[in-house]
Amino acid sequence: MRIILSWFLVFGLILIGHGQTATILSKEGKVPLESVLLHSENPNIQGITNKNGQVDLSPFMSAEKIDIRYLGYKPIIESYLSIKEKKFIIYLEEAGITLDEMVISATRWQESSKGIPSKIRTISKSDMQLLQPQTAADLLGISGEVSVQKSQQGGGSPMIRGFATNRLLYVIDGVRMNTAIFRAGNIQNVISLDPFTIEKAEVIFGPGSVMYGSDAIGGVMNFQTTTPKLAIDKKWVAHSAVNSRYSSANREKTMNGTLHLGSPKFASVTSYSFNRFGDLKMGKYGPDSYLRTFYVDQIENMDKIVQNINPRVQVPSGYYQQNVVQKLLYKPNEKWAFQYGFHYSGTTAYSRYDRLIEVNISGVPISAVWDYGPQIWQMNHITVSHLGKNAFYDGLTLRMAHQYFEESRIDRNFSGSNRYRLRTQVEKVNALSINIDLKKTLKKGILYYGLESVGNKVSSQATAKNIQTEAPILVADRYPQARWNSYAIFGNYQYPFSKKYIAQLGIRYNLFNMEADFSRNLAFFPFAFKTTNIQNGAFSGNAGLVISPDDKTKISLNAATGFRAPNVDDMGKLFDFVSGEVVVPNIDLTAEIAYNGEINLSKLIGNSLKIDLTGYYTYLQNAMVRRATTVEGKDSILYNGKMSKTYSIQNAAFAEIYGFHAGFELDLPLGFYLSSRYNVQIGKEELNNGATTNSRHAAPAFGLSTLGYKKGKIHLQFYSVYSASVSYENLNEEERQKPAIYAIDENGKPYSPSWYTLNMKGMFTVFKSSTLNIGLENLTNQRYRTYSSGIVAPGFNAIIGFFVLI
């Protein structure tokens, strides 16, 4: 019966289309494939299939070579005439394991990974549909190659190759998300992205500054979100989808609805998601020091220490979030495309859990209140694309974007002079960016080049009040009022010496400047300056070589530099990172520079085994680090009601990171498969006295191993995630000062224990257009913290989700 229905579907699709409409199906199940990419160099045009696997081939009538690619399937090359002879029905065969996939991160253009010397990890839509990550931070974690730190449940700060926070770059639909207030401390901006709207995520490891600019030192995380789908027939089509999910560990309730509308030239997609995350429950078996035995609550207008009825429930850690995405596409012909995108993300306030569990020497909580206010991100984004052969380019993409960021911090001490002072610090950033990306195929090789302009306006305001009298209290702003600008020109040339050797060479020059006004804080601190202007520039470059002795072997060598320009957070921030110690502004900063070398080996053995090996070394020069300083000749100032020792961010250190990645994928008979990924990163950074300590953001060795089964309507995975320990002796010097987030060893010293989880996920096609997801995470109910995290990871977690396509 299934075979008969499949063939009825095939013939039905043929009848729906017209003579020049091709239908692309999977060879195994005869299922239509959506978002298959078709590309021709002559004529220079592209096409993409709709949800019925259909694409209009009339623009390809003169094409002798049409490259047809789809993630997870073997690429094929056909001519228009050969497709016509097949009556416009094309079958794609599942690739299983391959060295070739389409990526966009390396050059900002979609291309085959075969000619790219950098290591890139792709997280596909099918991975996300099976594993059901709650947030975009969790999405990165399922890669098995990115370690994620969480200070609180509403968190997620990736660590890649020993770097994190503002030494990593986030890119959404080709637009940089990093702003002038991305800090060296852990950040959680990535949770603003909605996993339901992410079509694909790519992580490029190592410096990516040539194509992406400042901050791309440890890596670049490139997220491609949902796009509108055009219709093939000369009429409007519509379809919608609904996702729902429940998770037991935090009583998550998530709903998503998506609506697609399309005609041959105009299309729209609308998506809305709502997440309700309750207080997170930790596991049963693990260190007792992780238990949440108390919390602070106000009872009759007095702060009270309340005994937690269930110490495994982390109170308070829950929050709500909603996301909206709206995109419009107008494509008048095969050469031009105009797209508008709108993104909105907003959370409720959520507690910074790692601060709420801190106690003083007497065991009394330090904070009564420590919350992040609502985190808001909004982006308006216009993209203009043109395909056409001329003297300057074969392809051009213009991106213009405006982003608005809002974040806040709300804190009050449990005791002392500030126990009644409720302080609120609000930061707002307006970011404008323009990117022009061009691609030109030359007689020998391809040139990728472009221009970038980025501007940030930072507004910072702090207020406080006495909670008993409501009287206002004057407090210092976190940042000066500031502007940060960056202008760049770049180029990257890919030259094939032969089929076996491909070289790549790139260069970028970046000019940046920063203006800051400290007037609002002069009443609090005797700075010797009122305003400041910093201007500097930086070159970056890369050189790579890909060697392919045969179709089943890829060896790549890559050398690259990266840089991070000082931003407003580095230069102008005023905050207390530890009680009694405060960071003050420094107007003499310059860019830090990274030098990286790596070697990658990918090898197919037969048609069923793939091995990946990578080794790398990175040296960071002029690293911006926290160092002791003086203000008006004094080493301490009065801040937050107490005399505090002064520090500033300075170009005063070096750091070095080295490590390796090893992984394999194995196809087994009867639909089974096996894979494993393991990562080791070792880092050193210079201390104030010239000695070194282990790098704060070099996570302990970690990995992911998976046994899966995929056949027909069933996809199952049993997998384990695991991490090595970090002893007190190997713990970063700064991390040693945070005993609240670490376990205690037999000598009474903080350390990070090793841990593992066992997990199961299943996805079942219940009907033709609906799927059921079932998951069981942390089956052995381990109580563990990922490295450097404040929140304890979930204990046993049962997940059920349902997807319906209408």
Question: For each predicted feature, which ranges?
Answer:
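Face-selective signature of the C-terminal outer-membrane beta-barrel domain
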Residues: 3, 331-345, 374-523, 530, ...
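Short, acidic, small-residue-rich periplasmic hinge/interaction motif at the N-terminus
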Residues: 28-29, 36-41, 69-73, 85-129, ...
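Short acidic/polar hinge/loop motifs at secondary-structure boundaries
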Residues: 55-58, 177-207
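A beta-strand signature from Gram-negative outer-membrane beta-barrel systems
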Residues: 90-91, 192-241
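Transmembrane beta-barrel wall of Gram-negative outer-membrane proteins
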Residues: 250-277, 287-350, 376-378, 497, ...
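Surface-exposed extracellular loop regions of Gram-negative outer-membrane beta-barrel proteins
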Residues: 348, 359, 404-408, 464, ...
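Outer membrane beta-barrel strand-and-loop segments of large Gram-negative receptors
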Residues: 425-437, 486-488, 584-590, 596, ...
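Gram-negative outer-membrane beta-barrel transporters
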Residues: 498-499, 511-512, 616-619, 639-733, ...
